[in-house]
Amino acid sequence: VKLKILTSVAALCALFLLSSCAPTVHLEPAANANDPLCAEVTVRLPDSIGDQDRVWTDAQATAAWGTPSSVLLTCGSEPPAPTTLQCVSLGGVDWIVDEEDTPNLRLTTYGREPAAQVYVDTTTLSADAVLESLAGAIQQLPKTGECTAPVTEDPDVVGDETGDTAP
């Protein structure tokens, strides 16, 4: 009996030590992170994207992958207004591509409410692969509009200047 108790205590201690070593990424929640639709998104997010495993975050309706994080997601943003930035459609979701901080991209859903934003370090993962991996979860957000003519065929998100803009 003592051996069973000691084994159980040792296993619990090992689990605690391993979980305390897991990184927690600090993120700020979006203004509408408490929207129940964001909960529908977060429970459907993948455990990994490419070779990047999901890591803990400390804010509602957020997610991160990789150590250090190469993909960050927040849900609950205000939907973006029409813009001249490139728009791509991947996995049934329209995205506005902000390349201002290349090689890091900010991708914002277009025509979904609430909106979600994804930040991708493209030196680690392809933005296209990230968006395809997230599409199933993001589709939980109701579609309220779409880009007028988004890039849909082989849309290499980075550096594709031929994409249409959001209306």
Feature-to-residue mapping (PLM):
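Extracytosolic low-complexity repeat regions of secreted or lipid-anchored proteins
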Residues: T84-P167
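Short, charged/polar surface micro-motifs in flexible loops or helix N-caps
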Residues: S77-T84
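Bacterial N-terminal signal peptides that target proteins for export
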Residues: V1-V9
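C-terminal motif of bacterial Sec signal peptides marking the signal peptidase cleavage site
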Residues: F16-S20
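Intrinsically disordered, low-complexity prosegments and terminal tails associated
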Residues: L15, V43-G50, V157, E161-T162, ...
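Bacterial signal peptide processing site
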Residues: C21-V25
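N-terminal secretory signal peptides
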Residues: H26-S77
